[in-house]
Amino acid sequence: MKILIDDANIDAIKALYPVYPIDGVTTNPSILAKSGRQPYEVLKEIRAFIGAEAELHVQVVGRTADAMLEDVECIHAELGAQTYTKIPVNPAGLEAIQRLRKAQPDAHITATAIYTPMQAFLAAKAGADYAAPYINRIDNLGADGIATAKIIQDMF
């Protein structure tokens, strides 16, 4: 099991790191936008604080497989190839995950925007290392987010 902070607030990250056994940080475009700063400026500050050995998950913003793969190249160029790229599980994202896995077998891939166990299954088959279900959003849609996450966990 790993503990990841889902935040881009460097002060919050710095406050939590000495208290809890944190394995890394996840971000997304909405979290980064709340900082009011340039995304890569924030991400580089996070990377510098947590170190190269800790996990940093950064989401692509492209809408096509080609655009997502361009985002991956940019993320790796700015933050290092050890950075996990978060790719949404939609048709373009599944294509991007497969192409990235084939081109870079050692790439670190987190499948995101997952609402169902089938999406997680498809992401794993495509080559994702992690599946990140949207538990709160699943709950907001009237389903049970925790139960969905348990099903996904049991599948693997």
Predicted regions and their residues:
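Active-site beta->alpha loop and helix N-cap motifs at the rims of alpha/beta catalytic domains
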Residues: M1-K14, V19-I22, T27-A103, I135
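Catalytic alpha/beta core domains of metabolic enzymes, predominantly
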Residues: P91-L94, A107-F156
